[in-house]
Each structure stands twice: as structure tokens, then as C-alpha cells.
């Protein structure tokens, strides 16, 4: 019934018009699972390798090598495997690749297969993916972390911080949270328009206006929240992804906030965050310092770790070895989970489990280059992660995840839980 009979990959396009890998896995029963692989713009130094072809085709971004690796190398190995053996299949692909960073076959090849196998198995058993992956206890809907103003690598403007987000923590359900976030998004558009700013959207569906400073972004969002009829700090909190590795200059060891004309040391960056947290209802800061600035991260954790979620993205790259190092050193209190940073579902689930055991939160995340694939929505519920970061309520590649979460909440009925502020279980409120 669940024996794999065929594995097939093709090259398709992601939301930025760049090629990516799509994989289909076919089972004896006739069931099929399909998965598409996402891709990031600002990538951590220690991420698993995304295989690109180079050359002139698609400006070097083609993925025919990764597709060939699925069709010629991985497929013959997996035919005959039971799709229910997710751990065995993922382990076999890791061994087949044989490198620390999946650089031989490509994390984009391996991940596509890993996700498609899970979907095929769920379809064969006639189970929703979140139930197949998480069992009967999978019932917590995540608080959305909605990126509504873009800066940094995600936009061409004077804003240094990559993402300014809203989190509707005061809602009673996911449906209400999504409505809150969406109303604020539309309110923000009006506010920006009234100030004469551009309202075109960036990679993740958020606006990318040419604001004069990072603080103006926060002030504008507060205005939008209030104009939408919500209370900042109570019903809606703010979150930021600084993506500091993009601001860090290795030569002088300083952070260059070119939009503001500032050059700051690690200590000055921490002081900058303390100032912002004192002024605005910020509940989460991601990658506040460079991925190799462990001393700076420790300082930030010591100063703000009790009241602000400090998320490691480039810092931990969904990697249990990096996360273990962070836990041991008391660095950060949360991990961002991106399936393509590590490359298999098994390793993704291992990272989430390790984080939770250590009292860290886990935030399930999209990438800036996304597709219509909504697997991460199911993963968020399957693992009861409590938080999801998947862009603004704009662009189908982002909304696909939100719509899937609405379906899941509907399906769960009275069993569905939305924990709001309780999702930040390790903060001393």
C-alpha cells in the first residue's frame, strides 16, 4: 500500500521567478505526494547547501542538477522503501549525500523528496498532513508573525532592519488573529498613502516604503494598529527581524546601519534594542546580532532575554548542533525553523523537539522565495509550535499558508487552540 513506486522531480518557479525543485512521490496504492522547495534571500553562512547550476541559464539560478540528483540518484534508491518510514528515508538520503551540509545532492533535492514522501504517506492513509506528522495531539494554531514593512535585503529603501512584523496575541482564535493582522495591513496601506509613500509590496507581501529611519517604521505601524481599532501592546505586539549579519562589517567588527548613517558596536546595538523595547511593544527580535557574534548575542540575552523573545535564525540555522551550543551558552531563547536550512523533515522535527526540551520557543518560518506549497502550515500545527512567520496577508505564496491554517482550525473545530500570548511561554511577562 505505502511502498514507493516512483519519485520524480522537475524544475518550476518560485515567487521571485527563480527556479526551484518540485518533487512527486508515487505509492503502490496510487497515492501521490507533491512538494515544492522554498529559497532564501538573506542566507546564514551555516545553512545546508541549495544546489544551483550556475552558467547563463536563468542567470545561473537553474536547478537542473538538483532535479537530476532526485531523478537519477535518489529515486532508484528509494523505490521499494515504505513511505511510512520517514526517519529511515531521510537518514538514507543523508547517507547518500555523505556531506555535512548536503552539498553533494543539494538540500533542495533532499528536502523536496522528504516533504513529498510525508505528503504521499498522509494521502495514502487518508489523513491530513498535520495529523499524520503530529498525531491526535496536534491542535494548537500558531500566532502569526506578519511582516508588514520590509527593509534590508528584502527591499530597496533606507530601512536597515529587514522585517517589521505584527503579532495579534490578543485574538481568541487563529481566524480572528488573521482578521486582525489583515485589517492592520490594509490600515497601514492607507497610512502610508496619506504620507505620500509608495505602497508597492516586497518579496514577502509587506510594504517597502522609503522611510527615513527604523523608528519611523515602528511609529507608522503603531499608527496603523490604532487606526484599525486595535490597542498596541495589548491586542497586538510588534516583532522585528534585524538580519544583523547583513549589517555586520567583518573588517571593522561593527554594524553599519547605512540608512541611519550609524556605525555601532555589539554593545551599542544591544543598547539600541533596549531603547526600542522601552518605547514600543516589541515582543520578539530575530538575529539581533551577527551569526558569529556569540558574545553580543549573550549580552543581548542577559539584558533582554526575560522579556523579549530572542530568535536565532542565521545564528542556529535549524541545526541541532548550533542550537545545542546556544542552549549551553545561554544564547537566545527561541529558534526559527526553516525546513530548507537543514534539508529533511526528520532533522527539522529534531530541532523543534530540542528547542522545546530546553524551554526555547520554535517559530516555523517561510523563506522570501516561496511557492504555493503549504507544508509549513501543517508543520506548525503538527508540532504545536505556537508561532508561524509567513509574511503579510498579501501575495498567494504567503496567503496559501494562512488559508491552510484556516482550513485546519475549521477541521479541528472545538479541539482547536489559539494560545496568543501564552505561546511565549518562556518570557517573564
UniProtKB/Swiss-Prot annotation:
Annotated metabolic or biological route of this protein: Carbohydrate degradation; glycolysis; pyruvate from D-glyceraldehyde 3-phosphate: step 4/5
Pfam families: Enolase_C (PF00113), Enolase_N (PF03952)
Residue positions binding (2R)-2-phosphoglycerate: 162, 338, 367-368, 389
Function: Catalyzes the reversible conversion of 2-phosphoglycerate (2-PG) into phosphoenolpyruvate (PEP). It is essential for the degradation of carbohydrates via glycolysis.
Family: Belongs to the enolase family.
Residues at the active site: 204 (proton donor), 338 (proton acceptor)
Domain of life where this protein originates: Bacteria
EC numbers on record: 4.2.1.11
GO cellular component term, pick one: cell surface
HAMAP family: Enolase (MF_00318)
Protein localization: Cytoplasm; Secreted; Cell surface
Name assigned to this protein: Enolase
